[in-house]
Amino acid sequence: EREIRAFIPVTYFVIAGEFKTVGRMRESKTYPIILECEVQPNKKEEAERIVREGKNSSWEIVGVDSTEVSRSPKAPFTTSTLQQAASSRLGYAPSRTMGIAQKLYEKGLITYMRTDSTNLGAEAIAEISSVIEKNYGKDMLQVRQYKTKSKNAQEAHEAVRPTHPTSRSAGTTDDEKRLYSLIWERTVSSQMKDALLKRSKVTANIP
């Protein structure tokens, strides 16, 4: 409590810029990079000076540090995660998502869309494994079981998934096809190995 009362808020400015670099292989092509200034001035005048100097100068990359990181696939969809993904990826409101999912379910293309479970049945996992081996290679397969976070979820129920994972595309309307594709991708990727990503830190200065 004493530390909270003694805390004095400090104003500072975060400065970032978008830079374009000339590709080595194709001189005509540029690649945008977002860089953040290490200095965070607490005065507006100083921040404006840095921005002004940065805009009117040529920059030189002085260092690139790269590290490999792994990222695990996300669990198969529950009702809530399907709504969230459809909102961010497709721009669908929750009610629109559920309406489309209802039609896909009625056509026998996906499992029941109201579920808190991330569980996949043994038969579904076998089909998904076959799809991965055939299309991406056996090395990309990693069978996973996801533990449902909801205490009230019934593990006997399955996650929202394609009823026939071998079908990459399904649905009649564009909305149905887009949502089905989203569900298919999430379901199949849930049984794949971790993605290996390269994270790079670029340091640039004004020479």
How would you name each of these model-derived features?
Residues E1-P207:
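Core catalytic DNA strand-manipulation module of type IA topoisomerases
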